[in-house]
Regions:
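Bacterial Sec-dependent N-terminal signal peptides
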Residues: 1-19
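Short, Lys/Arg-enriched, disordered terminal segments
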Residues: 1-3, 453-460
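Mature catalytic domains of secreted/periplasmic carbohydrate-active enzymes
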Residues: 18-362, 367-394, 398-400, 406-421, ...
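Short, conserved beta-strand segments of beta-strand-rich sandwich/propeller modules, principally
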Residues: 428-430
């Protein structure tokens, strides 16, 4: 790794690591731990894989589910090499087919020819995640187009019992994922979901797991499936104003500066056009460069990245998807070399979220003078979010080797914010905070040169 040995001059009137009062709301311990994960995988693999559709109807024969070479160790091994921290599995999608032998549905792997009806994909993945040091998450669609009780009060108990099975038999769960889709069941009726019951099951059996839906309660949908968060991205949100399937969710997707609850955003996006595997999309896998841009636009905008990898009919991650993930991991590692690291004992550069710089009443400016010009195209900031999210707006002034200045204005920071720009040889830069809920606190400041697979600047 090329190592810079320059000195940094920090010009600011500031207080370092002084204890300050939180600005509420603040994250719980499990929400804080979840934010540190940043990047993990979604595994869409179920009946739809074999029927070549995105949404099944619940009328599919269990005999259709018969992977020829299912290997959860392969999934976990690739995810680990890709730098992911965990995997979330679609245990039951809208068609109702369950990937484990549940006592509460007859539509499951127990009725399939795979392993003569003795298989359990959830068990296999749980063991693989443990082997490779990954966390396990569960996606369990509340909508069920197969179950005869769907559309009645009894179904809520069925769903809760399936939750209990999944939450008590497969080890620690880090995230429980509720899909917002709610359509008709086999009897033509829709279900009124008992969300308080569903939430209570997770809190009872897996208290350290965060729960995802449009409206939380712990983490929320970012509002699109295209792989990006927004320039303004608050973790606080008016949670009591939204609900799963909320029709005016677009009005709340950015979060709110005056939000009442801490519910951080998650970006979900697929490596292919579809969520499930389709053979005609083998040549449409997102490139490593595209994935890196998605990473910056999600993790770099105060959100976590949930990247979907569709498993194919063999029960394996396809070679094209694996190759792209490995390429993404390689250029991400090369790009995330902090050009400011090791140059100061200042809390801004120690890599810890527990220490921070605090702006004074007289000066809200950080200036970094570089003794040697460096090629830079990204500046990253972090707030110590355990004390709340504070910054609502700021601007970065770049000064290149010729003395030419450029000012970039931006919105929120939160857990992590990456400001990208056309590569330039920087002589210095400064950050001015123009809006904040309380005293500005910055725990980390880094600079990068993001590159493409062609070893060229990523941002042109």
């Amino acid at each position: 790794m090329f190592r810079f040995t320059l000195l940094l001059t920090i010009l600011s009137t500031s207080i370092f690591a002084q204890k300050v009062s939180p600005v509420y709301p603040i994250p719980s311990a499990k929400q804080l731990a979840w934010s540190e994960l940043e990047y993990y995988g979604f595994i869409h693999f179920n009946m739809n894989t074999f029927t070549n559709v995105e949404w099944g109807e619940g009328k599919e024969s269990p005999s259709s589910f018969n992977p020829s070479a299912l290997d959860c160790n392969q999934w976990a091994r690739i995810a680990k090499k890709a730098g992911m921290k965990g995997l979330i599995l679609t245990v039951k999608h809208h068609d109702g087919f369950a990937l484990y032998p549940s006592k509460y549905t007859t539509h499951s792997v127990a009725k399939s020819p795979w392993k003569n009806g003795k298989g359990d994909v959830v068990k296999d993945l749980s063991e693989a995640c443990k082997k490779y040091g990954l966390k396990l998450g569960i996606y369990l669609s509340p909508w069920d187009r197969f179950h005869p009780d769907y559309g009645t009060d009894k179904y809520n108990q069925v769903y809760a019992k399936m939750q209990e099975e999944l939450l008590t038999n497969y080890g620690p769960i880090f995230e429980f994922w509720y899909d917002g889709a709610n359509g008709e069941g086999p009897n033509g009726r829709k279900q009124v979901y008992d969300w308080p019951l569903f939430h209570s099951m997770v809190n009872k059996y897996q208290p350290n797991a965060v729960q995802f839906s449009d409206a939380g309660p712990d983490i929320r949908w970012v509002g699109n499936e295209r792989g990006y968060a927004y320039d303004t991205m608050w973790s606080p949100i008016l949670r009591d104003k939204i609900y799963p399937g909320c029709l005016d969710f677009d009005n709340y997707r950015n979060g709110q500066e005056n939000g009442t609850h801490w519910v951080s955003p998650e970006v979900d996006v697929s490596i292919r056009p579809g969520w499930y595997y389709h053979p005609d999309q083998d040549d449409k896998v997102k490139t490593p460069d595209s994935l890196l841009k998605i990473y910056v636009a999600s993790v770099g905008r105060n959100a976590n990245l949930l990247l979907n990898i569709p498993v194919d009919t063999r029960g394996l991650i396809h070679e094209n998807d694996s190759a792209s993930l490995m390429g993404f991991a390689a250029i991400r590692a090369k790009s995330l070399v902090n050009l400011l690291k090791g140059n100061s004992v200042d809390p801004l550069f120690d890599g810890k979220n527990s220490t921070y710089w605090m702006a004074s009443e007289k000066n809200n400016l950080i200036k970094v003078d570089l003794n040697f010009v460096q090629k830079v195209n990204t500046i990253m900031l972090q707030e110590p979010i355990a004390l709340g999210q504070r910054v609502s707006s700021f601007e970065v002034e770049l000064v290149d080797e010729t003395g030419i200045k450029e000012v970039i204005k931006s919105g929120t920071i939160g857990h992590k914010r990456m400001i990208t720009f056309k590569e330039r040889k920087l002589k210095s830069f400064q950050i001015r905070f123009t809006g904040s809920r309380g005293p500005v606190l910055i725990s980390n400041l880094e600079a990068y040169r993001f590159i493409s697979t062609r070893n060229e600047p990523l941002f042109q």
